[in-house]
Amino acid sequence: MLLYMSQPQEATSPPLHSVSVAGVVVREDGRLLAIRRADNGTWELPGGVLELDETPETGVAREVWEETGIRVEVDELTGVYKNTTRGIVALVFRCKPSGGVERTSSESTAVSWLTPDEVSERMAEVYAIRLLDALDGAGPHVRSHDGKHLIPAG
């Protein structure tokens, strides 16, 4: 046993997760900020990869600004969502708009303020639930999905 433990191990490292952030930006009238992605045409929350040198709150404010032109005040973490297929863990924060003007970016073809019903109509289940979770006030929620469908907790 000691001989085995003293030998160098050539085990492969387990795959690592990527951490992303997204903002549920809620206007006073209850409408929610969403983007239509340029790469695949889907409606989602503004967000992206968290950079190594920033806090999650700083990262979500940066991503919302870059993708929509809207400045935000970050309120609270409302959910943690793991994409089991791609190894992405998304931290989702409820935010309030604090300035700026809506605009598209290289990552979006449309920026819109949607009602909760429009969110359910336009977004895939795994993205719509993030907005709906942020509105229910019972978070933070922890959920997993395969990129298309939620995976029941268990």
From Swiss-Prot:
Classification via InterPro entries: Nudix_hydrolase, NUDIX_hydrolase-like_dom_sf, NUDIX_hydrolase_CS, NUDIX_hydrolase_dom
Q: Superkingdom of the source?
A: Bacteria
| Sequence ranges assigned to domain Nudix hydrolase in this UniProt record | 15-136
Kindly list the GO molecular function terms attached to this UniProt entry: hydrolase activity; metal ion binding
Q: Where are the transmembrane segments?
A: none
Question: Which key words tag this protein in UniProt?
Answer: Hydrolase, Magnesium, Metal-binding, Plasmid
- Which positions does UniProt annotate for Mg(2+) binding? 48, 63, 66-67
Motif Nudix box, per the record, lies over 48-69
Asked if Magnesium is a keyword of the record, the answer is yes
What family does this belong to?
Answer: Belongs to the Nudix hydrolase family.
Report what the protein is called.
Answer: MutT-like protein
Q: Which organism is it from?
A: Streptomyces ambofaciens
